[in-house]
């Protein structure tokens, strides 16, 4: 007669109590509020057995549960023999380590290690279990923005790029930012799509978020980034990509023309460059340039060059886009300065002649005119009604435009004043009463050559000492000690004429009238002018009083004046008579 199943089971348990305890442990339902161990992908998972080691412990075991609830034993340790055995489970081969206190370690944590592990401590009478749940985390790679657009265009929705985040567990979330602010989806302006792909061999996720964006002009320097938000052992974290900046294309809204010149003002002879630019991006590369008086534009790049400009280049210049939709204009003034000097170059005139000189200018602004003679600035413009030797020299008429840098003109006049030699002789007895000094005052240009001749006897102490030739004048002198009356002749000769003048000189023993060696020509001219004025007044009064008396008086006056001049030129009448008598005696 067979035993009932229940009775048979009880009998079996009495014979094999340990087996019954293990079977009972396997049939226990999962407990709530399980202990969790957080592990990092690739690191070692450490799971302590959270049971108190009982008396009479025979061994300890670790197992994990399959998704369907069935157990898989992986490690065994005997409390008596102190030996450890690892079950033949391929996923955990060479990865397990069970310590004396029944702490289980798993090397090189994987995503597949996310399971419910159970620590079992077995005695003869009981089996104790404590489950541990393992959670594995993998930090993702830094986000990268790939497949970036070459440029963005306003008013156009365009793929900006893809933010790729690799090897994350659990899967993370990707967010786009512009200048540090979250980009929220806006229809036809901001379009974001996220895809997640799991690697079946590793269990890791790769997230790809694409961004389509319609920019504005203000986005020209905007920084775009993407951030992945993921979970780690210590909580939620984020990683940001490197920022990227995109070139934003937008149409030209304004055209500007500028004048490129080395100075603020333009003068004749300068090179001028006109530059046209548009505020679009990219800027226009070609424009139409309009010069004054022309209706058709000249097609060119963004610059138009004019070389060696003239005054007729003054006017309004324009530039426009090729389609002529936008235009700008600017005015150019080419400054000029003309100078006309009459006469100019080398001019030769005779002394006493008149020479009209004019320096006229024509300019775009008021100009300053000044004269320079022989490197010295003149106070007034030269005027020659009666040329004198001192008027000769190098004249420069110079004019400048103060407001225009580098604009000045100058012309030169080299004035040569020629004259035939003019001679005036003077004599003076020296203080030692032993000699006389005879001076020949000479005027003329070119400079006359002077020669002396002596008629009579007498010793020539010092001959031909010449003063400096200044303003067409110089003097030559000799010192003589005549033993008798002599005649000295001064000969002055230049390219125009030869002039000869003689002077009678008494013997040193005969006193005579001495003339001053030199007189100031200006003073003599003033004296002559005053004399003429006085004579004129006197003559007028006498004419009113008595015409006949005045005529007689004038006749007498002129006779006396003539005799005085004769005396002055020849020495005096007495001296001449004495000289004639002495000469006559000598001849006898």
UniProtKB/Swiss-Prot annotation:
The family database entries (InterPro entries) matched by this protein are listed as:
CD80_C2-set, Ig-like_dom, Ig-like_dom_sf, Ig-like_fold, Ig_sub, Ig_V-set, Surface_Rcpt/Adhesion_Mol
Membrane-topology annotation of the record: Single-pass type I membrane protein
The residues exposed to the Cytoplasmic compartment are: 554-588
Extract the signal peptide range: 1-33
Give compartment(s): Cell membrane; Cell projection, Axon; Cell projection, Dendrite
Q: Which UniProt keywords apply?
A: Adaptive immunity, Cell adhesion, Cell membrane, Cell projection, Disulfide bond, Glycoprotein, Immunity, Immunoglobulin domain, Membrane, Repeat, Signal, Transmembrane, Transmembrane helix
What is known about the tissue distribution of this protein? Detected in embryo. Detected in embryonic spinal cord and embryonic brain. Within the spinal cord it is localized to axons in the dorsal funiculus, midline floor plate cells, and motoneurons. Detected in embryonic epithelia and brain. After hatching, detected in bursa of Fabricius and thymus. Detected on embryonic retinal ganglion cell axon growth cones (at protein level). Detected in embryonic retina and in the optic fiber layer, which is composed of retinal ganglion cell axons and their growth cones.
Which Pfam families does its entry note? C2-set_2, Ig_2, Ig_3
Mention any one GO cellular component term assigned to this protein in its UniProt record: axon
Give the SUPFAM superfamilies listed for this entry: Immunoglobulin (SSF48726)
Sequence ranges assigned to domain Ig-like C2-type in this UniProt record: 251-333, 338-414, 421-501
* Listed name of the protein: CD166 antigen
Q: Which organism is it from?
A: Gallus gallus
The lineage is: Eukaryota, Metazoa, Chordata, Craniata, Vertebrata
